[in-house]
Amino acid sequence: MSLPALPVWNWTTLSLLLLLAVWQDLAHRRIPNPLLLCTASAALVLAAMPQGIGLVSSLAAALVAGGAFLPLYLLGQMGAGDIKLMATAGLLVGMPRALALCLSVAMAGGLLALGWAWQTRKPQSASARTANRMPYAVAVALGSAWHGLLTLPFP
């Protein structure tokens, strides 16, 4: 099954979002709400354009992508910014790409988590675990890049 082509502006916007989110997550362990809100607004405008992916597809993908990782937030394993980042990425990729994106991000996150656990394998208190939480924006970026490489039509 091949996925429908995604407009170049969506890939460009997603790439810029992920670069800025990774930078902020690594530097401050936060993904700023204004970044996500501006990108979500741009994603909705892109979706509504005649060549866009469609508002219904975009909104459904945001629910799928954000909802897929919501249990990890509820268990305290991810931050709210990571969930909002996934939902915003969903707005940009639409359905059915959001399903493949979630799988790619989950696999990248699992591999990064193994490396993170190996690096920080000393026993820690609960407060130290919170301060030493893995910046999941990196996993979202790597998973998105992997997804893009697997699904982009190359000549």
Question: Residue locations for each model-derived region?
Answer:
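A membrane-topology feature that recognizes alpha-helical transmembrane segments
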Residues: 1-155
